């Protein structure tokens, strides 16, 4: 048996923060899960011990308490879908049937009054979530939330096809899949709701703003893969993970794959920091708040990842760090060799050109 991997402290230049009502929110989310009977009794019993309310409180440390609670319930609901149907349920091996279920759930999210799936706990929970999204968000934010949920569902069906076939995608396909099946993009509208504003399309749809949101998703999901590798590798079922993809594609040992994954996420973290700081200098107060929330999302996922029993697995402890470092292992400005995301680094050249255009030409004597 190969020696157990030890995850070193990961690079994080972002400060830790948490909502002061985190303990109350965690209790409320556990009660919400019981009220709507999310997942099987066994799964629900696990989810309510995983500090999901605390995770939400780390994502929105200064947000409206009602939205922090909404986000916590939504994250738990997502785990009810992912753990209950995709990862551990039979539908996770039947992509066609899984697509049918998820398509029906999307209809419930779009039109909660539709008389369908009325005895389904996940549908009931989703109806409650949709009503609360309507209460705290605008019509545009609600529409983007539903659209992002569809993206998430689409990606987990793709993953289910690999699970059924027992195949591992290449790194580019895995990266593209992971940007969505980590359910990070579906959280983004709630970052705005949590602070009572709506980022306007002229800023939200800018290439650079979209890119930093994708970078945040990459960092969060790569970190999740690093933290969950111990649990997933020790399990008996099929699993997809960045380390496994790197092992297969590049012929690496688990230790080498861990080093490669850390290098990749460090390089993206450095790029995220540079581009988000540039955007903050020229953006509206709403954009600056959005960028701050992306940072909180990244750091919140990190702090939750090294502390939740979901990943520390006390019965079979993982060798996880208890702190983070402010020194990256890789601060190169060269693009990652992943076509789906290599264009992110084009933003550095675009910013340099923008700076040159702003510098007045020197007149000759």
UniProtKB/Swiss-Prot annotation:
Pathway: Secondary metabolite biosynthesis; terpenoid biosynthesis. The keyword Cytoplasm does not apply. Mg(2+) 2 binds at residue 87. Mg(2+) 1 binds at residues 82, 87. Pfam families: Terpene_syn_C_2. Changing residue 178 to K/N/Q: Lack of cyclase activity. It comes from the Bacteria. The record marks 182 as: Plays a critical role for abstraction of the pyrophosphate group. Mg(2+) 3 binds at residues 224, 228, 232. The record marks 83, 159 as: Plays a critical role for substrate recognition. Changing residue 159 to D/Q: Drastically alters the product spectra compared to the wild-type, comprising linear terpenoids in addition to germacrene B. Unable to produce selina-4(15),7(11)-diene. A motif (DDXXXE motif) lies at residues 82-87. The keyword Cell membrane does not apply. It catalyses: (2E,6E)-farnesyl diphosphate = selina-4(15),7(11)-diene + diphosphate. It is an enzyme of class 4 (lyase). The record marks 55, 79 as: Plays a critical role in the stabilization of intermediate cation. Binds 3 Mg(2+) ions per subunit. Keywords: Lyase, Magnesium, Metal-binding. Belongs to the terpene synthase family. Catalyzes the conversion of (2E,6E)-farnesyl diphosphate (FPP) to yield the bicyclic sesquiterpene selina-4(15),7(11)-diene via a 1,10-cyclization, which requires the abstraction of the pyrophosphate from FPP leading to a (E,E)-germacradienyl cation. The only accepted substrate is (2E,6E)-farnesyl diphosphate (FPP). The Asp-Asp-Xaa-Xaa-Xaa-Glu (DDXXXE) motif is important for the catalytic activity, presumably through binding to Mg(2+). NCBIfam families: selin_dien_syn. This is Selina-4(15),7(11)-diene synthase ((2E,6E)-farnesyl diphosphate cyclizing). It comes from Streptomyces pristinaespiralis (strain ATCC 25486 / DSM 40338 / CBS 914.69 / JCM 4507 / KCC S-0507 / NBRC 13074 / NRRL 2958 / 5647).
